[in-house]
């Protein structure tokens, strides 16, 4: 009897051991390692970079010039133009972060002359982003995210360029909320985000809609245009308009193109119209 009980106990132990031995744990998928890398002259792009890094808990590093630009805006523009004419790029200090150790790189820059600032070009010329995911983000006076992304794709053909984020320097106060929405919408953060409807087909701009356009761009020297057609969609706290406008001739800048541009304008409740970006 004792032998029978012992044999039964051994059988149970053996079955349990086999059962435990055959059980497989599902390996946890490792979170992608992320780096926020940016160049900033005035601090605007730095503010966006820090907001992204803080939200994601990502590493962060600044691209720094050996001979920084003058804080004066016009002096910087003059130097950039001279460097462009001479085919010269600014020298930068070595970046400490090893790109090879990261899966996703958030690359930030101010937009100058329709693309990323020259120090970023210098960095891209020496960096290898093959097999990496790049998330561009930028600050600008009127626009340039779309054109910068095109240039980035040409400069780094081995990388996957993901959707980017851009904000006007004049609208930096809206950035924290927009960054949250951007990171959630693109799967970098968990949470709920506002998914906007597509714009409907544009129609000829009415007098009232043209007045909204004029009010939004009033005082901005780089936009001298007339609203042609428009579409609109609802925002949680107002309305967003997408205008197609025609650049008008300018006596002070006869070389300015007179082609069509797209201008995004938001009108929040009880606030004046503000343009958010221009696509040329």
Task: For each feature predicted by the language model, list its residue ranges.
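Bacterial N-terminal signal peptides that target proteins for export
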Residues: 1-7
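C-terminal motif of bacterial Sec signal peptides marking the signal peptidase cleavage site
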Residues: 16-19
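N-terminal beta1-alpha1-beta2 submodule of the flavodoxin-like/Rossmannoid cofactor-binding fold
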Residues: 24-107, 114-116, 121, 210, ...
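Short, glycine-/small-residue-rich phosphate/pyrophosphate-handling segment
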Residues: 135-174
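Compact beta-sheet-dominated globular domain cores
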Residues: 159, 199-207, 253-280
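C-terminal helix of von Willebrand factor
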Residues: 168-191
């Amino acid at each position: 009897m004792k032998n029978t009980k012992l044999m039964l106990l051994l059988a149970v132990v053996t079955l349990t051991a086999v059962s435990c031995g055959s059980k497989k744990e599902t390996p946890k998928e490792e979170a992608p390692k992320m780096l926020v890398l940016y160049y900033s002259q005035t601090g605007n792009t730095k503010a966006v970079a820090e907001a992204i890094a803080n939200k994601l808990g990502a590493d962060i590093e600044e691209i720094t010039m050996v001979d920084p630009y003058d804080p004066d805006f016009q002096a910087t523009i003059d130097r950039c133009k001279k460097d462009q004419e001479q085919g010269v790029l600014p020298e930068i200090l070595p970046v400490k972060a090893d790109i090879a150790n990261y899966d996703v790189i958030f690359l930030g820059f101010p937009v100058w002359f329709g693309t990323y600032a020259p120090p970023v070009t210098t960095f891209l010329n020496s960096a290898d982003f093959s097999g990496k995911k790049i998330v561009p983000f930028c600050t600008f006076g009127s626009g340039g995210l779309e054109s910068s992304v095109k240039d980035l794709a040409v400069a780094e053909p081995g990388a996957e360029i993901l959707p980017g984020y851009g904000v006007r320097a004049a609208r930096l106060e809206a950035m924290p909320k927009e960054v949250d929405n951007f990171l959630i919408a693109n799967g970098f953060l968990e949470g709920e985000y506002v998914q906007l409807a597509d714009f409907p087909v544009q129609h000829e701009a009415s007098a009232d809609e043209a007045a909204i356009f004029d009010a939004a761009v009033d005082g901005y020297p780089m936009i001298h245009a007339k609203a042609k057609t428009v579409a609109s969609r609802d925002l949680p706290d107002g309305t967003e308009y997408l205008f197609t406008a025609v650049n008008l001739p300018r006596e002070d800048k006869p070389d300015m193109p007179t082609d069509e541009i797209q201008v995004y304008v938001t009108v929040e409740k009880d606030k004046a119209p503000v343009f958010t970006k221009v696509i040329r």
